[in-house]
Amino acid sequence: MMYHIPGVLSPQDVARFREQLEQAEWVDGRVTTGAQGAQVKNNQQVDTRSTLYAALQNEVLNAVNQHALFFAAALPRTLSTPLFNRYQNNETYGFHVDGAVRSHPQNGWMRTDLSATLFLSDPQSYDGGELVVNDTFGQHRVKLPAGDLVLYPSSSLHCVTPVTRGVRVASFIWIQSMIRDDKKRAMLFELDKNIQNIQSLKSRYGENEEILSLLNLYHNLLREWSEI
């Protein structure tokens, strides 16, 4: 399943990120991909050896970790170190699948269950640059407001179309979820949303056994399916 997570960064945060990224050192994006991906990848990434990169990636991690909707949809166990990319002058990234595992600075290795793109450019400021994701439900073309994030299975074929005007800047992350199976994770997310909707009526109708029963079901399923 694909999920739109709005407002991960505020407009003020986005403006500050963009100002700082203007000062960043950019390198060939192929430095972080394998041989197959390098054949279709043509973009730039912030140099991960820079002091600025260390500060920015920490801010992205803090933002996503504090976002309740992101947590509910992803149920993250491990987050990769965020990276930042830039597309301009017809740069693109052809169809590819993300690697199944990635190195992680604390855990050694992590499994990539989910991929996330956090948009940092106003969609009106550039042409092209859509994230195109193919999954079992068809093809999705994504171009979100700055500060919003899209979450999708890492097993999906996806690409970024050529940027023909302006500049597209984004951060991207991989997530190892506590729930490996996409279908089970989606069911838990739907159950969680329904529980939240019912709980919003609690002030009017008070606590009831139905809410407690659903909460019990959610946590028992999470306990049964999670890998910690």
Swiss-Prot record:
Disulphide bonds in the chain: none
Oxidoreductase among keywords: yes
A single BP term in Gene Ontology: intracellular iron ion homeostasis
Binding site for 2-oxoglutarate: R168
Listed cofactors: Fe(2+); L-ascorbate
MF-aspect GO terms: 2-oxoglutarate-dependent dioxygenase activity; iron ion binding; L-ascorbic acid binding
EC number(s) from the headed UniProt entry: 1.14.11.-
Cofactor note: Binds 1 Fe(2+) ion per subunit.
Membrane spanning residue stretches: none
Positions bound to Fe cation: H96, D98, H158
Pfam families referenced in this protein's UniProt entry, alphabetically: 2OG-FeII_Oxy_3, PKHD_C
Domain Fe2OG dioxygenase as annotated: residue spans: 78-177
Protein name, UniProt field: PKHD-type hydroxylase YbiX
The species this protein was found in: Escherichia coli O157:H7
